[in-house]
Amino acid sequence: MKTILLLRHGKSDWDADTGDDHARPLATRGQKGARKMGRFITTARVPPDRAITSSAVRARETLATAAEAGGWTGPARVADALYEATPEAVLREIQAETDDADTVVVVGHEPTSSGLASLLVGGGRIEMKTAAVARIDVPVESWADVAPGRGALAFLLPPGALRPNAYRKLKKTIDKAIDARKKAVEKAEKVGAPKEKPYKPASLPRGGVDAPGGPADAQG
């Protein structure tokens, strides 16, 4: 099994005097979101073995902040190809990974991140807000075999859904969902049954599971 974590960069600082989209840094809110997601990914039992990030400053800062918060120790590489990339181009970067890693986090942009998630699970509309993370499990032994439609979406969460006291409850819910999806994939592989239709997961609201949702961020 290979696991892909698609992490959209955190909210960027539009007021930063950079004069260059590539150099735009994270806003304070973006840093906070990246820290939340770094801790959550580790709590959800999927700390990445390796990371790939866009060369944009906001993406590199997102990875660095999330890795520090989550205690990730795996190596990371910067890929210029992930900046203004197509979903297919990012997929090629993933396929080029070496098989000693089972979980890889990919830090990128919109609409590429949501497009790649949809491509991997075989279709469906997926929306990734800033600093949102999508976990996709692919029942293969080699990254080279990761292909469109072969993945199963285990979860998709924005940072606004994560309150500090909600981590444990969410972890239990996610563990159950992951186990159920794995069993479904394994059963389908054994009997050659058609895969489940792609689905859009129910969105969790900003600020916690009981709070109203927030607006999507505009930038990529």
Regions found by a protein language model. Give the residues of each.
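Active-site-proximal alpha-helix that buttresses catalytic centers in soluble enzyme cores
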Residues: 1-80, 85, 89, 125-127, ...
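Residue-level preference for the first positions of well-ordered beta-strands
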Residues: 4, 101-105, 133
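Short, glycine/serine-rich, charged loops/turns that create anion-binding
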Residues: 11, 56-58, 111, 140, ...
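Glycine-rich phosphate-binding loop signature in dinucleotide/nucleotide-binding domains
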Residues: 44-46, 97-102
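A glycine-rich beta-strand to alpha-helix segment
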Residues: 102-118
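Domain-level recognition of soluble alpha/beta enzyme cores
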Residues: 124-159
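Non-catalytic, charged low-complexity extensions flanking SF2 helicase motor domains
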Residues: 175-203
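Long, low-complexity, intrinsically disordered segments
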Residues: 196-220
